[in-house]
Amino acid sequence: MQVLPPGSTGGPSRLFILRPVATTLLMAAMLLAGIIGYRFLPVAALPEVDYPTIQVVTLYPGASPDVMTSAVTAPLERQFGQMSGLKQMSSQSSGGASVVTLQFQLTLPLDVAEQEVQAAINAATNLLPSDLPNPPIYSKVNPADPPIMTLAVTSNAVPMTQVEGMVETRVAQKISQVSGVGLVTLAGGQRPAVRVKLNAQAIAALGLTSETIRTAITGANVNSAKGSLDGPERAVTLSANDQMQSADEYRRLIIAYKNGAPVRLGDVATVEQGAENSWLGAWANKAPAIVMNVQRQPGANIIATADSIRQMLPQLTESLPKSVKVTVLSDRTTNIRASVRDTQFELMLAIALVVMIIYLFLRNIPATIIPGVAVPLSLIGTFAVMVFLDFSINNLTLMALTIATGFVVDDAIVVIENISRYIEKGEKPLAAALKGAGEIGFTIISLTFSLIAVLIPLLFMGDIVGRLFREFAVTLAVAILISAVVSLTLTPMMCARMLSQQSLRKQNRFSRACERLFDRVIASYGRGLAKVLNHPWLTLSVAFATLLLSVMLWIVIPKGFFPVQDNGIIQGTLQAPQSSSYASMAQRQHQVAERILQDPAVQSLTTFVGVDGANPTLNSARLQINLKSLDERDDRVQQVISRLQTAVATIPGVALYLQPTQDLTIDTQVSRTQYQFTLRATTLDALSHWAPKLLNALQSLPQLSEVSSDWQDRGLAAWVNVDRDSASRLGISMADVDNALYNAFGQRLISTIYTQANQYRVVLEHNTANKPGLAALETIRLTGNDGGTIPLSAIASIKQRFTPLSINHLDQFPVTTFSFNVPEGYSLGDAVQAILNTERTLALPADITTQFQGSTLAFQAALGNTVWLIVAAVVAMYIVLGVLYESFIHPITILSTLPTAGVGALLALMIAGSELDIIAIIGIILLIGIVKKNAIMMIDFALAAEREQGMYPRDAIFQACLLRFRPILMTTLAALLGALPLMLSTGVGAELRRPLGIAMVGGLLVSQILTLFTTPVIYLLFDRLSLYVKSRFPRHKEEA
């Protein structure tokens, strides 16, 4: 047994140094736990930060936006408005469709929200129209969240109506049962139905009306209970042929007798097998298709959900005819996996670069192996804690681990360097390990807890940004904490067993050259430091100038919210004149599709026209453009968007709005562009007055581009003005008028056909082919008192006027949303400020309110909290350092290094043309924790020299700077190289990672140069200040 020299206690490391087997087994257990934990970690693009969101859709075919608002949306909103935990309620009421989107507080569980929504729908049932075809349907999905998967179902042989029937029952229902799927929608509107198109002239000639025929059809097709017979011995169930299943059966239906002869439905109408809604259509690459969009539930694991769907697809498609093809057009998980793979590669590259730096400085394989073991062990051990906390492998947690490679190696470097120094002086490895580890233990603890203190404010950030970065902060903190444990246990134990004087002194030509280079660098630094200490006020002026410069740069740098990602999918809205019909929109989308599919970067395209829960108005179309992978195309998504908009711009009568899909979705409605701003009023009249004025003002701002509004009040409407007195005299009620109009022009669902697998509808309408437009109203006839038919024109006049195409509400008040993008050369911060200035210039009345929405609102909140976040990080670190050093002064000396990091980060971002967004701000906060390490290592050794060797402060800090120069340079370069792969990232999701790397590399480069000189000067300044205070207050000195 070795005899240990006095004082070689080893501190907290002693037990682990003296018991190598136990230490090895403990570390092996941690490694095994991490490996097992990694296998259970789900993969995602970002941490799950979705607001609990529920969408309620109510369809009422034929109803105008006014009717949908007053009869359907308003009663539902009144009930929903009473729910607790509701954050925001928005609605869209358009022709035949009402969509209410409910966004709840982040803290409310989605299941609880679902129960409240169901209760509210039940309470509103008696307030809704009695002839609603279906009750309101809710789904746990955010409509603004892009589909996780889009599938196109096409066939050259089978009609689309039959295809939808098969897909709905055999495919869509099964996919909707997959865990994590929130909603499966079939875009295309080809749901099978029997369509009855009345011939107005024929029914008028026979003295019939549409209401008579509707009543006859409804009475002829029933499916109700009939009872049973219960005899002494047998029970018999009653059944009848009360159901009609095919168009041919309806065609033969007798609807009346005239002069003793039967009048069959086929005599007065065209009866055919068709689609339930003839004003809906979808296309995949210009071919008619049923487009299946799969959306996930908020909080669901997107990778696991997509994998489950892909596994069951082969089995589901086998149940379809061979002529029916199912094609996966887009799968968001493809890019998510690619992004995660790229980040994992950057993590491995960062580890390799860090180990290379260690070898370059230590030039010794055993000494390089020790931290080379500590880095992966600390990172892998973090996985075990991540599983326990329900985290995932995503871009942010992997970024945290990549950055952590530079952090976790710092502790090991500091320990190894200190132990090596004693071994080189001639002490035995075990004694050197105990002495070096004991001496450096407090420094390791100071470094660790002061760095974790910087991350604490991130945990208390509010709303969605705080939830987003919680996994990042905790993952990084856990890795740093494990690193400290490894550095105080495994690292000194390995040093005691693997290092020796012979191994450390063994040098080759490369080692000797590096040693001479380092010696010259240290000598040059020593000469420069001596000059700086002789001219302290000049150095202090530089330090003060960096503080002022950092404030100035903070003010002028362009500010953004979240990097715009290239995920390979573009969402689009095609806008046409407000009076556009379905047929004209279908033709326009074909022209647009032709241009888009010619672009070399486009892989596939889906388009949708018509009004349903996803598309609010008939004059708009939805597009999803799927791009080729980044490896197969030369341009990024923004360049592709510009090229597509240029190609479509020459098509008359259309405006195309495009935006790339993002992993982070905060909005609750699909918008035309990236950012939204709302104008809310108490009445529609006030909204119609101010909306055009604000739109014109916003369109004139250079800070905004592609400004548009969803306020559309120039749709054409036929106003039927009934003379109530004349109608009453003839025995015609307003209900008769509404029914006649609904029967003719509402695609009215009048009956249900029940099959073994599904239910289909019978649709009633007038055949308007011979009399299109307003002329079709001349064919409407009603039944009078005497049983005769009376034309509508006898009791009503028809006028054409303008009407809103949709009526939108925000928290029950009328609202319009302005969508905009930010042109090149401006930032989101510039755009927000310009909008606020315009609002003040217009002097809006008190009953008109404005508000940013979605990511713009989150940007405002984040921008307001950023300064406080940085202040909180600095204060938290000051408190921790003050407690550790038992001093009010020394923490200030350490924190004086921070402005240099801010200057470097902000300058680097501006040079790179990057905005100061949330990711970059996180990088600056991390820099606060990194750059103070230099000061801590200097001050720790200076204080120890003053205390133990009785050195003067100037000599102590000068010696500490020279002694710690090499570990300071090593740790800074390790942190810099850990961030370098992020800065140089070019793969999928690089937009998300690059700002963090740029901020950290820039901050580290500038701070490394400046703090080596400013910290000693500031240390001596505060030392003199402390002596001055003690001289002025002798009592304090005596107490000391």
From Swiss-Prot:
GO molecular function: xenobiotic transmembrane transporter activity
Transmembrane segments: 25-45, 347-367, 369-389, 396-416, 440-460, 472-492, 537-557, 869-889, 890-910, 911-931, 968-988, 998-1018
Pfam families (alphabetical): ACR_tran
Location(s) in or outside the cell: Cell inner membrane
Signal peptide: none
Membrane topology designation: Multi-pass membrane protein
Keyword Chloroplast: no
Keyword Nucleus applies: no
SUPFAM superfamilies according to UniProt: Multidrug efflux transporter AcrB pore domain, PN1, PN2, PC1 and PC2 subdomains (SSF82693), Multidrug efflux transporter AcrB TolC docking domain, DN and DC subdomains (SSF82714), Multidrug efflux transporter AcrB transmembrane domain (SSF82866)
Family as reported in the entry's similarity comment: Belongs to the resistance-nodulation-cell division (RND) (TC 2.A.6) family. MdtB subfamily.
PANTHER family in alphabetical order: MULTIDRUG RESISTANCE PROTEIN MDTB, PTHR32063
Name of the protein in question: Multidrug resistance protein MdtB
Gene designation per UniProt: mdtB
